[in-house]
Amino acid sequence: MARRLSILKQPIFSTFNNHLIDYPTPSNISYWWGFGSLAGLCLVIQILTGVFLAMHYTPHVDLAFLSVEHIMRDVKGGWLLRYMHANGASMFFIVVYLHFFRGLYYGSYASPRELVWCLGVVILLLMIVTAFIGYVLPWGQMSFWGATVITSLASAIPVVGDTIVTWLWGGFSVDNATLNRFFSLHYLLPFIIAGASILHLAALHQYGSNNPLGINSSVDKIAFYPYIYVKDLVGWVAFAIFFSIFVFYAPNVLGHPDNYIPANPMSTPAHIVPEWYFLPVYAILRSIPNKLGGVAAIGLVFVSLLALPFINTSYVRSSSFRPIHQKFFWLLVADCLLLGWIGCQPVEAPYVTIGQIASVGFFFYFAITPILGKCEARLIKNSNACEARSVLASFLTSIGLLWW
């Protein structure tokens, strides 16, 4: 026992001990707080499966599609690696989106955790970029045309747009140079995400985790191990079952059948659809007819998320005690689901109009956030004043009865 304690005092092990074993955690956190560790698990799965897949993948336009088929047919366990990697990306986004909306509901972006939130938004942006360039690598029809459409959006940037597109492509069209660049970046970015995740964790542990009540307490806390560890372990088991259902029974249900057709620059798919986790942002992009306006709207999405901690005016963190904000939060959730549905529909009426209305609704939430905090503060103040008057009236009535 003494030897174990002496080892834990060494610099590297003490850091590990302070952040993952003895880390003081609020005793009332729920299972919603387990999605952070699940996101870390998903990242590890993606990195490990990606490294092994890269050993058999060939980043060349003539061989990329065939190398993926080689992995599926000839590499022992290759089908499992590919399906774990492809479905692992979807699981990663599911977990991160739930983690994100939990933070939004319980006010985890509020002071003093602004840096934690901003790092989380940066990680989300890195995930989207990594997933997009990874989707290009199989070099199927949807991969090729998705890369062509999305990268060409950079041409909307004034003055330097065309230069950026040429630099991204490595030429004047999506070709072998593009595939090589995307493969290199797709291999690199997960490690950058891992580094950003460590910074995210360090920033979180500077002030401690939030809790469902949204209050600060340095007394009512417990060690992460074994209490929170066991709670997270339950979530890991449930996640493993959910993940396994997709990997073993429905591995292609979240993909697109057109991507099993080799890329053909001479044949455009009837409907170019990105992966499901891009659909809300893709719907906002499509809702604006002007290309530059669409790109600006995507940028505004992430600017709004980054600005949220600084435009928040509420003194109460948790939406459990903010009934007005709670309603707007659920409207935002419904709006994001609607945007996701619109993103996979054809660009025609009435989907375009619905997408435009839903896009306005998305940004309306961030526009009204500062007003909600002030309105709720005024309601609380008036409620306290009414309660004080009621107590005073009751007290005076009691005094009068006693005197009588």
From Swiss-Prot:
Major location category of this protein: mitochondrion
Subcellular location(s) of the protein: Mitochondrion inner membrane
Residues the entry annotates as binding a ubiquinone: H205
Cellular-component GO terms for this entry: mitochondrial inner membrane; respiratory chain complex III
Record-annotated membrane-spanning stretches: 35-55, 79-101, 116-136, 182-202, 228-248, 292-312, 324-344, 351-370
Family matches, as PANTHER family: CYTOCHROME B (PTHR19271:SF16)
GO BP field: respiratory electron transport chain
Binding site for heme b b566: H99, H200
GO MF assignments: metal ion binding; ubiquinol-cytochrome-c reductase activity
InterPro entries assigned: Cyt_b/b6_C (IPR005798), Cyt_b/b6_C_sf (IPR036150), Cyt_b/b6_N (IPR005797), Cytb/b6-like_sf (IPR027387), Cytochrome_b (IPR030689), Cytochrome_b_C_euk/bac (IPR048260), Cytochrome_b_N_euk/bac (IPR048259), Di-haem_cyt_TM (IPR016174)
Subunit text: The main subunits of complex b-c1 are: cytochrome b, cytochrome c1 and the Rieske protein.
Swiss-Prot/TrEMBL cofactor(s): heme b
Xref: Gene3D superfamilies: Cytochrome Bc1 Complex, Chain C
Additional free-text comment from the UniProt record: Heme 1 (or BL or b562) is low-potential and absorbs at about 562 nm, and heme 2 (or BH or b566) is high-potential and absorbs at about 566 nm.
Pfam families in the record: Cytochrom_B_C, Cytochrome_B
Function: Component of the ubiquinol-cytochrome c reductase complex (complex III or cytochrome b-c1 complex) that is part of the mitochondrial respiratory chain. The b-c1 complex mediates electron transfer from ubiquinol to cytochrome c. Contributes to the generation of a proton gradient across the mitochondrial membrane that is then used for ATP synthesis.
Family stated for the protein in its record: Belongs to the cytochrome b family.
Stretch forming the signal peptide: none
CDD domains attached to this UniProt entry: cytochrome_b_C, Cytochrome_b_N
Topological category with respect to the lipid bilayer: Multi-pass membrane protein
Keywords: Electron transport, Heme, Iron, Membrane, Metal-binding, Mitochondrion, Mitochondrion inner membrane, Respiratory chain, Transmembrane, Transmembrane helix, Transport, Ubiquinone
Residues binding heme b b562: H85, H186
Protein name: Cytochrome b
Cofactor binding summary note: Binds 2 heme b groups non-covalently.
